[in-house]
Amino acid sequence: MQLRAAAGGKKAPSLTPLSELGKGAADGVGWRVMLQKTLRYLAFLSAVLCLASAAWAGFRLEQVMSYSFPDHLVAAAKSGRVAWVSNQRGVRNLWVAEAPHFHAHPITHYTADDGQDIPALALTPDGSTAVYVRGTELFEDSGDVTNPTSNVHGAKHEVWAVDVAGGEPRLLGEINCAGEDCEDLQISPDGKSVAWAGKKQVWIAPVAGGKAAQQLAQVRGENVSPRWSPDGRCIALASRRGDHSFIGIYDFGRDSIVYLAPSVDRDSMPRWSPDGKLVAFVRQPGVERGLPLIPERPHPWAIWVADPTSGAGHELWHSGSTLNDSLPELTEDASFKFAAGNRVVFASEQDGWNHLYSISAAGGAPTLLTPGQFEVEDVTLSSDGRTVLYSSNQSDVDRRHLWRVPVEGGAPQALTRGETMEWKPVETADGRYVLCLGSTATTPAMPYLVTSTGRDMLGKDALPADFPSAQLVTPKQVVFPSADGLQIHGQLFVPRGRTRPGPALVWMHGGPIRQMMLGFHYMGYYHNAYAENQYLTNLGYVVLSVNYRMGIMYGRAFREAPHCGPKGAAEYQDIVAAAHYLQGLPIVDAHRIGLWGGSYGGLLTAMGLARDSDIFAAGVDFAGVHDWSVFVANLPGFRNAPDAEEARKQGWESSPDASVEHWQSPVLLIQGDDDPDVPFSQTVDLAQRLRANHVRFEQLVFPDEAHDMLLWRNWVAGYKATAEFFERMLKP
């Protein structure tokens, strides 16, 4: 082997052959000089080998989680400015960039990993001001805001504004809405006011501040989804009344609400036509009591249009009555648009795939915009409203790319392609630029400008210089059969240089309506998990990330597979199939396979240990569900359901708790005790059952922390504990 100069340009010292060491010994010093040169060379060789090893083998968890995760990318309606939320090591700030050069820079300067999320962002039409929310939604039962730092003054859920030109953020009011993703900021067409829903009413505040937020009107029910009319004179809203709901129009010049074609049904998602003459909305049947819980049944729906002045309306289109005709769960709200040319864009799964359609507001048959065996996810209109920009997995099933299609129909145009991933497209007001968020297998999510030849990263300085991209592996797409023949996709992470059998891990996402991809994920929770899987791979584990049935992007039949969840846990067979796949690899020791996951992935972790400790030697369970019967008993309509007790029994039998007497392998339980999604009591109860059955378990509890943990330092602590636990349980 010929050694070349090390990095930095220094020449390697010459090596004297051992046969020459005896020469010059007569002067009493020659051999010592030669020996010193040899030792220096060996030291140099050792340093070179260490540097080469570090270049691909060694990095810290903090390094691979040091990225500046971007989210909530938005574009101004009348300027070339875009904005997004950046979360770097738990410090969340707003960044902006502007056409044509898109030099990115922060406009807020928060400095602490304080657990204060920024779940919503909007720009005024001219792009001069950003309006955003800080804090998390209220617990519906207690009315509290998550306070993960245990601050003695508590935490708040507030709306703020900051001018892009500079200055300190100003408080506009409290939002205090309940429910995941309830933060819905709507800025008026003139950019002077912002409306939002909170405390069951709609509120309005001046963007300039100086005046307290005011309740828009006193309206019965829970009022959500405020939408400004194009002229700014009215606000449409959805008023939920329990078993029915209305679309109401608040006119700033009137003293009463106009309701659009009120009925016994449930109306939602109001959308104004570009000229303000019509409002489109979705109508579903009102709540029917006494229905059984176990059978699957269709959820038909219709699109209505109405005159916002008179309230008169009519049905524009209605779905069929099969399961595929149900209102799609994936993108029903985000895909519902009133576009240019008097056309309404909507999502439907009538052919078994989540696709976009459009229909003229004057009537007629809908047009399929996105044909094929793939699914659409992010959806937005172009600045002129004549085309739809969307992300999908078309032609690249385990990635996302961007596409464009005219609202009247035509061949979709691919905007991005290749071994990258893109999502959340936006277009500048002049229609010249498309921007998005994106990642690769080894580069974390960042904002990008889409070009004719690819994409250009914005805000490169936000990516830490020591981020270990060169040391990460590119996961391999794998497909394997489950016990019933269903084909399951996964991503296989293999340590570099791995040739002999060693430990392996199965990882399961939560949701379960999620899909993991061949790179850093678009959701913060899974972006973190992808980094942890890279870290575990770096420590010597083969990791298989499993897209089990019930996940998205493989068609409705896959997502809505029968006998899953509390109705039979059929999805668990996919996890066993993943273990069997690993057992068949020559680089995996079949006796040292563990599993880990969070939320639904935590449930499947517990299921694996409870049912198959002979397959899974250890597991880490982040906030998993352990007893489905508790959730079944809290379903709407449970009390009046004729099969209530049968459903509860079925839920119990589909749970890890039901098989705890077979549980033998050790487990690490991790959860925050202020979890709004999976009650902490699920972990408390499981721990008592494990104790009673003498099963070894360890625990890491974060007081006052949420389900999707808000503190970066808690993610790091949890992931370090995961790696250390597997090191003790699976390494020889």
Q: Where do the model's predicted regions map?
A:
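Hydrophobic beta-strand positions that form the internal "hydrophobic ladder"
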Residues: V82, A130, V194, G232-I235, ...
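Blade-loop segments of beta-propeller domains
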Residues: H103-D126, A130, R134
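Residue-level detector of Asp-centered blade-edge/turn motifs that repeat once per structural unit
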Residues: A77-K78, P125-D126, P189-D190, P230-D231, ...
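Beta-strand-rich domains and repeat architectures in extracellular enzymes and scaffolds
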Residues: E62-R92
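Short loop/turn segments that connect beta-strands within beta-propeller blades
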Residues: E98-F102, D163-G167, P206-G210, D251-D255, ...
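A flexible loop/linker signature enriched in serine peptidases of the S9 family
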Residues: V85-W95, Y110-Q116, V133-W160, P169-C182, ...
